[in-house]
Curated annotation (Swiss-Prot):
<feature type="active site" description="Proton donor; for delta-elimination activity">
    <location>
        <position position="260"/>
    </location>
</feature>
<dbReference type="GO" id="GO:0140078">
    <property type="term" value="F:class I DNA-(apurinic or apyrimidinic site) endonuclease activity"/>
</dbReference>
<keyword id="KW-0456">Lyase</keyword>
<keyword id="KW-0326">Glycosidase</keyword>
<protein>
    <recommendedName>
        <fullName>Formamidopyrimidine-DNA glycosylase</fullName>
        <ecNumber>3.2.2.23</ecNumber>
        <ecNumber>4.2.99.18</ecNumber>
    </recommendedName>
</protein>
<comment type="subunit">
    <text>Monomer.</text>
</comment>
<dbReference type="InterPro" id="IPR000214">
    <property type="entry name" value="Znf_DNA_glyclase/AP_lyase"/>
</dbReference>
<comment type="function">
    <text>Involved in base excision repair of DNA damaged by oxidation or by mutagenic agents. Acts as a DNA glycosylase that recognizes and removes damaged bases. Has a preference for oxidized purines, such as 7,8-dihydro-8-oxoguanine (8-oxoG). Has AP (apurinic/apyrimidinic) lyase activity and introduces nicks in the DNA strand. Cleaves the DNA backbone by beta-delta elimination to generate a single-strand break at the site of the removed base with both 3'- and 5'-phosphates.</text>
</comment>
<dbReference type="InterPro" id="IPR020629">
    <property type="entry name" value="Formamido-pyr_DNA_Glyclase"/>
</dbReference>
<keyword id="KW-0863">Zinc-finger</keyword>
<keyword id="KW-0862">Zinc</keyword>
<feature type="active site" description="Schiff-base intermediate with DNA">
    <location>
        <position position="2"/>
    </location>
</feature>
<feature type="binding site">
    <location>
        <position position="110"/>
    </location>
    <ligand>
        <name>DNA</name>
    </ligand>
</feature>
<dbReference type="GO" id="GO:0006284">
    <property type="term" value="P:base-excision repair"/>
</dbReference>
<dbReference type="Pfam" id="PF06831">
    <property type="entry name" value="H2TH"/>
</dbReference>
<dbReference type="InterPro" id="IPR012319">
    <property type="entry name" value="FPG_cat"/>
</dbReference>
<dbReference type="InterPro" id="IPR015887">
    <property type="entry name" value="DNA_glyclase_Znf_dom_DNA_BS"/>
</dbReference>
């Protein structure tokens, strides 16, 4: 599943080509995504100028003069720019054609993504209960410490909870916990304030660096500009179970936490 850096990479790739452009028409070839695409999306969006392309957690917000298209890439979705009128292939479900002659094309083989319309996106039911963005001043180690008190849940699924902080998915939680030296199995309530301060710093650092590197390409993700990400070449823990730790050489172990695979170093993380 594309994580926050991949979604931000997509946003940065498509925004310069969308912002200020007027939509000429919307072509929906298959509306059967996680939730059905609104039947009147073409009527609502066509003729409007796109004001801004923003992101909230893993949702892309394509803001028009009146209303906002909320898009989620799901498990296998991607958005890329093509020439308007380019014949569509299988799984290319939606084209948003622009007066510039380009079209924003949404592809999603598994159809777990979303394209929804809202006049008040930040109060939409999918967004209203989300926690703070990790790369803002609203998120820090103090928040992690305070929210974790009394919790017996393992620290990794705790930091992956979107009510605590958004966008820290499996890949980046694994990497941040490795960098902070925290065993992902440790109870969230047992982690000290000092270690949460370190973890928050590492979450911010790793996410920012992954965005700079274009995200992490695993399986299906392709950025909005057609370029894959390269951060996967620098992973220390994620997907490396059974391999030697890049820091100490100890064999990395893999366990299941919250139904997700989690890799850690038994020597570097405690």
């Amino acid at each position: 599943m594309p994580e926050l850096p991949e979604v931000e990479t997509t946003r940065r790739g498509i925004a310069p080509h969308l912002e200020g452009q007027r939509v000429s028409r919307v072509i929906v070839r298959d509306s059967r995504l996680r939730w059905p695409i609104p039947e009147d999306l073409d009527v609502r969006l066509s003729g409007q100028r796109i004001v801004q392309v923003d992101r909230r957690a893993k949702y892309l917000l394509i803001q028009a003069e009146v209303g906002t298209l909320i898009s989620h890439l799901g498990m296998s979705g991607n958005l890329r720019l093509v020439e308007a009128g380019l014949p569509a292939l299988k799984h290319e479900h939606v084209d948003i054609e622009l007066e510039s002659g380009l079209a924003l094309r949404y592809t999603d083989p598994r159809r777990f993504g979303a394209m929804l319309w809202s006049l008040d996106p930040h109060n939409h039911e999918l967004l209203i209960r989300l926690g703070p963005e990790p790369l803002t001043d609203l998120f820090d180690g103090e928040r992690l410490y305070e929210r974790s008190r009394g919790k017996s849940i393992a620290v990794k699924p705790f930091v992956m909870d979107n009510a605590v902080v958004v966008g820290v998915g499996n890949i980046y939680a694994t990497e941040a916990l490795f960098a902070a030296g925290i065993d992902p199995r440790r109870e969230a309530g047992s982690v000290s304030r000092a270690r949460y301060l370190k973890l928050a710093i590492e979450i911010k650092r790793i996410l920012a660096y992954a965005i700079e590197r274009g995200g992490t390409t695993l399986r299906d993700f392709i950025g909005g500009d057609g370029k894959p990400g390269y951060f996967q070449q620098e992973l220390f823990a994620y997907g490396r179970g059974g391999q030697p730790c890049k820091v100490c050489g100890t064999t990395l172990r893999e366990v299941k936490l919250g139904q997700r695979a989690s890799v850690y170093c038994p020597k570097c993380q405690r």
